[in-house]
Amino acid sequence: MPLHKSAEKRLRQSEKRNVRNRARKKELKVLLKNMQKLIDTSADKNVVEEAYRSAVQKLDRLGVKRYLHPNKASRKKAQLTKMLNNYVKVD
């Protein structure tokens, strides 16, 4: 338990931030899994591209706001792009 008032405040703030960070990362995880599921089930090309756009948009936002390291966001975007290109090439 914190002994000082400032330490109590830091604890409260870090707990709030932790919840917020987890929620944002969970949203991203859901988007990525959704795109993978669409590709695995051979969904319509337009639906997959829409899922790709929303995932890339979320990655950009998280990278800029530093919820993810910008390099990790960039790497994930490259992986998604490669996945999408392979899917489009197969169809």
From Swiss-Prot:
Region annotation Disordered: where it falls in the sequence: 1-24
UniProt entry tagged with the keyword ATP-binding: no
SUPFAM superfamilies assigned: Ribosomal protein S20
Gene of this entry: rpsT
GO cellular component entries: cytosol; small ribosomal subunit
Annotated function: Binds directly to 16S ribosomal RNA.
Biased composition (Basic and acidic residues): 1-18
Gene Ontology terms: biological process: translation
Family: Belongs to the bacterial ribosomal protein bS20 family.
Pfam family, one: Ribosomal_S20p
Name of the protein in its database record: Small ribosomal subunit protein bS20
One Gene Ontology MF term: structural constituent of ribosome
Keywords on record: Ribonucleoprotein, Ribosomal protein, RNA-binding, rRNA-binding
